[in-house]
């Protein structure tokens, strides 16, 4: 058998230098590593990796070029009780693969074995890693670096956002190309968002259970290859990387940042009955949190949990993040189930991965957003992430819904959440922007469904409506479903307007779910992770244009209010905020805790938000001075209101002084 040259231990993965390819693989417990390369007919040739520096195996294959398909067979002990599951019969993906050929199918040959190893060779059906050359001309691309105080995030799915857009060329709808098309860029600018946050774009797989049901994983939270773009949204797998970078470049030219939702908490290998295609066969003990009995700690609900306190896995995670920043110029990340990142196994603010990110000059300067929980003991960590992380604020989400949709919530609690939840986030030197405020997200009801459904309707997911949360804090306004008489539809509209105004005019970083500005509905499905169909795709032809205009006007208004864009905590007497009752007097202690849901919020001494969240029309006395309602609550030529606003039930209006 031909020998490989010894090569180098860095950089990690498969690196083409113009003359050949250097291969590396981390495995602390392997006894031998074989590089397997495949020709166009699927014939396999194996080479032992001859070099080892620390826990990194390496070798250099002269003459190898981009397009070469390869994988690894890793030899070592089969000792499940100790967490070792080496099985050289299974061809394994390179964790650093930049491109993958083939899908992860529900095939018996892909299972490595439970108690005993499965020695059937899987090369015929296993996905293959592919060597790439990632040269790209970024021209004059520059990161927008929008300050947190001026950031407005728009969470979207690559396919669902554009698949039904009638103004886009048919062949690019639902693809990376569509994201940077002038039609979409113009829409983003008109709406006023500053950052496009994409659901996972790293290559993912559909779980075997879904495949057997004829469904697919639509959202993408089942990662298969963390460095490779999901190929289904590109013209071809070969062009995916450049098409994505073209989109990033176009968005940057328009001043729009790109944030990636990334899944560093588990892999698509799932539990012990899941497929063995990469990490489990490379070094199960190092990559995953292993219980004393050899099974996995399942703090993710997905069968396994990545051990992000292990030095080799910390390095893997950081290199992955740096790859997306340096090679694809993304501007930040939203981390799924991010409490896993801080597990040691208990959560710690000085966990190894947090320390590594903070020390990295590349990663510490991009936007980092945590989903601050997992399902394990001690997994709920809202407010506890270290700088420079921002966090999804579920306190804001729940409080906004409970305030405007008939639930029990005090004025004081609402004000606290409106003020960026300072009781939660004003620590460790963090600014208000650390509170990422949201009403809705990809998981849960859409905003329209929040006002149309009291109960989830997830039957299409095939789990007899057991999946998805039951804590929706929603209100159908008297009738379950989308339709209803005119007065009911008007009440729903008013609730949506009030909720959007609360989101977009509160302190903190607002995140808008794509489609909420259209009135998009998922017909009560609050867990549409497996619905790659018209239920989740945005229907641009049926979009509520008036609601879109209303939302855009709110975002424009937000950018005019220094108290919101300054990203500094409000202090008494600083001129940023005053909290008033319906008579324009400071709220009393009793009104904060027991009063009706009536208040006025004066921002920057110029903008007044009058709130009537009661069920009755109520007169609200405005502060001294001349006030006029501003768009989207009135036209440009608005009469001056000098004294009283007659606030409709569940109503909100914004006035500007003078």
Curated annotation (Swiss-Prot):
Pathway: Glycan degradation; glycogen degradation. Its EC number is 3.2.1.196. The record marks 443 as: Transition state stabilizer. The keyword Cell division does not apply. Keywords: Carbohydrate metabolism, Glycogen metabolism, Glycosidase, Hydrolase. GO terms for molecular function: glycogen debranching enzyme activity; hydrolase activity, hydrolyzing O-glycosyl compounds. GO terms for biological process: glycogen catabolic process. It is an enzyme of class 3 (hydrolase). Removes maltotriose and maltotetraose chains that are attached by 1,6-alpha-linkage to the limit dextrin main chain, generating a debranched limit dextrin. Belongs to the glycosyl hydrolase 13 family. This is Glycogen debranching enzyme. It comes from Salmonella newport (strain SL254).
């Amino acid at each position: 058998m031909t020998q490989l040259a010894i090569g180098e231990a860095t950089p990690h993965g498969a690196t083409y230098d113009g003359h050949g390819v250097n291969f590396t693989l981390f495995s602390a417990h392997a006894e031998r590593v074989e590089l397997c390369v495949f020709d166009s007919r699927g014939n396999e040739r194996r080479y032992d990796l001859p070099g080892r520096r620390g826990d990194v195996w390496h070798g250099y294959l002269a003459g190898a070029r981009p397009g070469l398909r390869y994988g690894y067979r890793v030899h070592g002990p089969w000792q499940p009780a100790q967490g070792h599951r080496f099985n050289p019969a299974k061809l394994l993906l390179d964790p650093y693969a930049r491109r993958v050929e083939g899908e992860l199918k529900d095939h018996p040959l892909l299972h490595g074995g439970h108690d005993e190893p499965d020695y059937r060779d899987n090369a015929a059906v296993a996905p293959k890693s592919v060597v790439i050359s990632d040269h790209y001309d970024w021209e004059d691309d520059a990161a927008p670096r929008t300050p947190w105080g001026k950031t407005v995030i728009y969470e979207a799915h690559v396919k669902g956002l554009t698949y039904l857009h009638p103004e886009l060329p048919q062949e690019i709808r639902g693809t990376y190309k569509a994201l940077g098309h002038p039609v979409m860029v113009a829409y983003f600018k008109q709406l006023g968002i500053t950052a496009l946050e994409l659901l996972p774009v790293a290559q993912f797989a559909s779980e075997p259970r879904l495949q057997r049901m004829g469904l697919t994983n639509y959202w993408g939270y089942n990662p298969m290859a963390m460095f490779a773009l999901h190929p289904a949204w590109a013209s071809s797998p070969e062009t995916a990387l450049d098409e994505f970078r073209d989109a990033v470049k176009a968005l940057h030219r328009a001043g729009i940042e790109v944030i990636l939702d990334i899944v560093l908490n588990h892999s698509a290998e799932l539990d012990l009955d899941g497929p063995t295609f990469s990490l489990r066969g490379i070094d199960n003990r190092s990559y995953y949190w292993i219980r004393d009995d050899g099974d996995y700690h399942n703090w993710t609900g997905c069968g396994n949990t990545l051990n992000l306190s292990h030095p080799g896995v910390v390095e893997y995670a950081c290199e992955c993040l740096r790859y997306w920043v340096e090679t694809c110029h993304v501007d930040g990340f939203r981390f799924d189930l991010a409490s896993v990142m801080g597990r040691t196994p208990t959560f710690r603010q000085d966990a190894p991965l947090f320390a590594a990110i903070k020390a990295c000059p590349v990663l510490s300067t991009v936007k980092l957003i945590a989903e601050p929980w997992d399902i394990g003991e001690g997994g709920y960590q809202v407010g506890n992430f270290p700088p420079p992380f921002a966090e999804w604020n579920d306190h804001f989400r729940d409080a906004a819904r409970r305030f405007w949709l008939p639930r029990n919530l005090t004025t004081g609690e609402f004000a606290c959440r409106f003020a960026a939840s300072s009781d939660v986030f004003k620590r460790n030197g963090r600014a208000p922007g650390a509170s990422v405020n949201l009403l809705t997200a990809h998981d849960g009801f859409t905003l329209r469904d929040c006002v149309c459904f009291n109960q989830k309707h997830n039957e299409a997911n095939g789990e007899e409506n057991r999946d998805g949360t039951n804590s929706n804090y929603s209100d159908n306004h008297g009738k379950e479903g989308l339709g209803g008489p005119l007065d009911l539809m008007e009440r729903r509209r008013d609730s949506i307007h009030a909720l959007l105004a609360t989101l977009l005019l509160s302190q903190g970083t607002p995140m808008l779910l794509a489609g909420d500005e259209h009135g998009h509905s998922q017909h009560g499905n609050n867990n549409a992770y497996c619905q790659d169909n018209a239920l989740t795709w945005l229907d641009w032809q049926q979009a509520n244009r008036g609601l879109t205009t209303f939302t855009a006007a709110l975002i424009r208004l937000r950018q005019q209010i220094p108290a919101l864009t300054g990203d500094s905590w409000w202090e008494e007497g600083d001129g940023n905020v005053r909290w008033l009752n319906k008579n324009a007097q400071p709220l009393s202690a009793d009104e904060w805790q027991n009063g009706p849901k009536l208040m006025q919020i004066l921002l920057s001494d110029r903008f007044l938000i009058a709130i009537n969240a009661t069920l009755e029309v109520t007169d609200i006395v405005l502060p001294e001075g001349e006030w006029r309602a501003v768009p989207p609550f009135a036209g440009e030529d608005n009469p001056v209101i000098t004294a009283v606003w007659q606030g409709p039930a569940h109503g909100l209006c914004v006035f500007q002084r003078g």
